[in-house]
């Protein structure tokens, strides 16, 4: 067996010595590839390499289409299955080759190319990030999209802050108590239509609360009850009247007027119904006195089933 191994190992022996001592082959290798010139001295083979050298040739001849990596996997599995007695001659041969290599190349130091490969892989993975940093188009587009989304969210959150930012948060309480569903038409373009109405209602609410908060505090229950008794299609206004009654006794006037003026904006059919009696949201602030006249008109008429008519102050008539 040793003779067979020596015959197989004789061709690489002169190649290693010629690679280290022969000037022609070293010069040709250095001229062809200067980066690999210091790595021309190969490492001494270990026991597995000594054994797998002949086995690899056999397996490659038997399976010419098999990839080299698959051959290495199979050879590694077979090497693990070998016993120590079977591995012993290859281990001894590997020791002999290592001693010979140390004699021929006493100043040899193993420089693993694995580190350079891993660095190249890291550079490949980090290269797109580095390229994206100086390029302004992709970053600007990403920032623009993020800013646009952030602006839309901020606008919507601002409108919700106007809705729920009033004192005691009674609007959210009333919305939870009523629990009526929204119109399906508001799902797609509801947010775009609700924002100008919210902002207009805030200014109109401030105007109304400054001029006649007392009238709205006393008139809103009767006003909502009269709407519910006229046979309107939305039956939620009747429950809204009772809720507004309880809200009016415990909350300040501004909260009651806000709950009354904000509730019709929640559903599309309610908004269309109220537009027959009140001016639309596009009308400027001078439409607020007409709302007061409408509420006074409903206050003057008797409302059956309610005892609020006798207690309403009619000093403004």
UniProtKB/Swiss-Prot annotation:
Give residue numbers for sequence motif 9aaTAD.
Answer: 272-280
| Biotechnology section | POU5F1/OCT4, SOX2, MYC/c-Myc and KLF4 are the four Yamanaka factors. When combined, these factors are sufficient to reprogram differentiated cells to an embryonic-like state designated iPS (induced pluripotent stem) cells. iPS cells exhibit the morphology and growth properties of ES cells and express ES cell marker genes.
Listed name of the protein: Transcription factor SOX-2
- Protein species of origin: Homo sapiens (Human)
Keyword Cytoplasm assigned to the entry: answer is: yes
PROSITE patterns for the chain = HMG_BOX_2
Q: Which residues carry this modification: Phosphoserine?
A: 251
Q: Name one GO biological process term.
A: response to oxygen-glucose deprivation
Q: Provide the protein's localization.
A: Nucleus speckle; Cytoplasm; Nucleus
Q: Name one GO cellular component term.
A: transcription regulator complex
**Pfam families listed in its UniProt record:** HMG_box (PF00505), SOXp (PF12336)
What one GO molecular function would you report for this record? miRNA binding
Consequence of changing residue 74 to P? In MCOPS3; uncertain significance
Q: How does it assemble?
A: Interacts with ZSCAN10. Interacts with SOX3 and FGFR1. Interacts with GLIS1. Interacts with POU5F1; binds synergistically with POU5F1 to DNA. Interacts with DDX56. Interacts with L3MBTL3 and DCAF5; the interaction requires methylation at Lys-42 and is necessary to target SOX2 for ubiquitination by the CRL4-DCAF5 E3 ubiquitin ligase complex. Interacts with RCOR1/CoREST. Interacts with PHF20L1; the interaction requires methylation at Lys-42 and Lys-117 and protects SOX2 from degradation. Interacts with TRIM26; this interaction prevents ubiquitination by WWP2.
Q: Which InterPro entries match?
A: HMG_box_dom, HMG_box_dom_sf, SOX_fam, SRY-related_HMG-box_TF-like
Q: Which stretches does UniProt call biased (Low complexity)?
A: 246-261
- Its primary localisation, in coarse terms, equals nucleus
> Which post-translational modifications are recorded for this protein?
Sumoylation inhibits binding on DNA and negatively regulates the FGF4 transactivation.
Q: Its function?
A: Transcription factor that forms a trimeric complex with OCT4 on DNA and controls the expression of a number of genes involved in embryonic development such as YES1, FGF4, UTF1 and ZFP206. Binds to the proximal enhancer region of NANOG. Critical for early embryogenesis and for embryonic stem cell pluripotency. Downstream SRRT target that mediates the promotion of neural stem cell self-renewal. Keeps neural cells undifferentiated by counteracting the activity of proneural proteins and suppresses neuronal differentiation. May function as a switch in neuronal development.
Keywords carried by this UniProt record: Activator, Cytoplasm, Developmental protein, Disease variant, DNA-binding, Isopeptide bond, Methylation, Microphthalmia, Nucleus, Phosphoprotein, Transcription, Transcription regulation, Ubl conjugation
* Disease / disorder: Microphthalmia, syndromic, 3: A disease characterized by the rare association of malformations including uni- or bilateral anophthalmia or microphthalmia, and esophageal atresia with trachoesophageal fistula. Microphthalmia is a disorder of eye formation, ranging from small size of a single eye to complete bilateral absence of ocular tissues (anophthalmia). In many cases, microphthalmia/anophthalmia occurs in association with syndromes that include non-ocular abnormalities.
């Amino acid at each position: 067996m040793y003779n067979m191994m020596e015959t197989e190992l004789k061709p690489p022996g002169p190649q290693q010595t010629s690679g280290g001592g022969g000037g022609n082959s070293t010069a040709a290798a250095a001229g062809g590839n200067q980066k690999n010139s210091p790595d021309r001295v190969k490492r001494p083979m270990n026991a597995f390499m000594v054994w797998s050298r002949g086995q690899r040739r056999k397996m490659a001849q038997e399976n010419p289409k098999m990839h080299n990596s698959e051959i290495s996997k199979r050879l590694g599995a077979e090497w693990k299955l070998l016993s120590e007695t079977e591995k012993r001659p290859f281990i001894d041969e590997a020791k002999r080759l290592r001693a010979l290599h140390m004699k021929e190349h006493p100043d040899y130091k193993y420089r693993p190319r694995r580190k350079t490969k891993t660095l190249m892989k890291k550079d490949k993975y980090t290269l797109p990030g580095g390229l994206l940093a100086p390029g302004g188009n992709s970053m600007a587009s990403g920032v623009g999209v993020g800013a646009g989304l952030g602006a839309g969210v901020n606008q919507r959150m601002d409108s919700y802050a106007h809705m729920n930012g009033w004192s005691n948060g009674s609007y959210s309480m009333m919305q939870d108590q009523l629990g009526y569903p929204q119109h399906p038409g508001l799902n797609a373009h509801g947010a775009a239509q609700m924002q100008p109405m919210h902002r207009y209602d805030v200014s109109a609410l401030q105007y109304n609360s400054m001029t006649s908060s007392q009238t709205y505090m006393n008139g809103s229950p009767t006003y909502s009850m009269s709407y519910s008794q006229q046979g309107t299609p939305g039956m939620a206004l009747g429950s809204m009247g009772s809720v507004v009654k309880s809200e009016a006794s415990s909350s300040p006037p501004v909260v009651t007027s806000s709950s009354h003026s904000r509730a019709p904006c929640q559903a599309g059919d309610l908004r269309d119904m109220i537009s027959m009696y009140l001016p639309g949201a596009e009308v400027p602030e001078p439409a607020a006195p007409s709302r007061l006249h409408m509420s006074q008109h409903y206050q003057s008429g008797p409302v059956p089933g309610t005892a609020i008519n006798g207690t309403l102050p009619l000093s403004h008539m």
